Amino acid sequence: MSKHAVVQFGVVYALLFPGVFGFVPSPTNVSVVCHNFVNVLYWNYSNPTEQTKFAIKVEPYESPSQTVDTSQTYLDISSYSTDVEDDYLVLLTAHDGQEKSEDVSIRFTYSKDYFDENKHKYKCSLDFPAVNTSVHKDVIEVSFQHPFKLYKQEIMKEEFTYKITHDEQMVKYSCFEDEDLCNAEVHFNQSVAGQCVELKLEGVIAGIPSYTYSNVCVPQPTPETDKTGIIAALIGGATVVLFIIMGFVWLLWRKWSNIPQMPQGLWCIISKQSHTMLLSQPEPTDICPVTSQGPLNYLTEEDQSVSARDDTGADPPVVSEEGMAGEDSQGLGCSSDYDRPKFL
């Protein structure tokens, strides 16, 4: 066998059995996805063996390095890159037994102070905060939380600058972490009424970019209601209610006016009797006096004269027997006790 053939056979055999000659290929297509502070390293590797493992070394610029091994072709290195203000260099090496490949490196950072387009192949990013929209006439109102309230990272305690693009027109805005909400107004043409429009929102905070899209449907404007009819209806209703109240009052007045009045003569008798009873009654006591229901007894003129004499203390006149007899004869002719004199 010629020398040239032996060399060719050795190269082929070394490629097929790299562990025999100490040749271990390096990982390829190494990339890192750093988004929302979740950092995952990916790579490819051809013809791995049962003994193939990968060593990942994370070297922060401002803190000590850490190394971890895995047999997978990806690794979440978020727990090894928690400081979002630092710059990270990642070294990846393949191991097959005692042999190892050459290192493959990649850099990433969230910090604008460390980012260098020549050194950092990938630029870390964040999701734009959830956007709320509402339409009022010819304005779309946009609101969302400041990124610091969403991610709670000290690096984000600063101004958040963002821009909104609509219909090829871009407007810049800004807000700070102490504001409850970031608010913006986007004016649109009434010609888009009844259609949906797309808003593109792009923001940057601490040098970290974020963006999102929002579709907003603009409703058709509703015609203004003619208030003349409403006012007329209210006035008409009030008039009807007023007439009902007036009719009710009129019915009550008619009812009260039909109550019969007390005759004038009866009213005079009741008034006189009440006055007489008030004069003749003694001082009021707790026991109510009982009034007689019989006919009233009236004193004659003679009885009144006798009573008057008794009051003055004068002696009564002497009456003869003839006079007494005459009076008795006259008294026998009366059938009523009302004419008979009363003697006490």
Curated annotation (Swiss-Prot):
It is found in: Cell membrane. Residues 24-102 form the Fibronectin type-III domain. Residues 23-229 are extracellular. Residues 1-22 form the signal peptide. Keywords: Cell membrane, Glycoprotein, Membrane, Receptor, Signal, Transmembrane, Transmembrane helix. Residues 300-344 are annotated as: Disordered. Residues 251-344 are cytoplasmic. It is a single-pass type I membrane protein. Highly expressed in brain. Also detected in spleen, heart, intestine, gill and kidney. In immune cell populations, detected at low levels in monocytes, peripheral blood leukocytes, splenocytes, neutrophils and mature macrophages. GO terms for molecular function: cytokine receptor activity. One of its GO terms (cellular component) is plasma membrane. The keyword rRNA processing does not apply. The chain crosses the membrane at residues 230-250. Induction: Up-regulated in response to ifng1 (interferon gamma 1) and tnfb (TNF-alpha 2). Glycans are attached at residues 29, 44, 132, 189. It comes from the Eukaryota. Belongs to the type II cytokine receptor family. Receptor which shows binding specificity for the cytokine ifng1 (interferon gamma 1). This is Interferon gamma receptor 1-like. The gene is ifngr1l.
